[in-house]
Amino acid sequence: MSDKLTILRDLKSYLQSNYSNSVKDIILFGSQAHGNSNENSDYDVLIVLKNDYTARDENQIYDLCYDMNLKYSIIIDAHLISEKELTTIKGRQPIFSKAIKSGIYA
């Protein structure tokens, strides 16, 4: 678990340094968080942003996640949501509500 936390914290720090301080939370969910992953499992990560974001912002964040993929030889499957979206129907989708409820926070 400590390796996963190291990766999560490094990802959060990297995004805050290279994207902006609008990154509120990084949450690991899915098989990596629940202990039923294998060597081919990706890292499902929910990135909660303080502000709204554009497609350009999304692409920038995905590029930064790719840097972390290379650094750790993993695959990050990033999902973005803003704090504002958490209060909408998008935020109530099971993928997001489960991640927030039972995921591992950086």
Residue ranges of predicted features:
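P-loop (Walker A) phosphate-binding loop of NTP-binding proteins
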Residues: S31
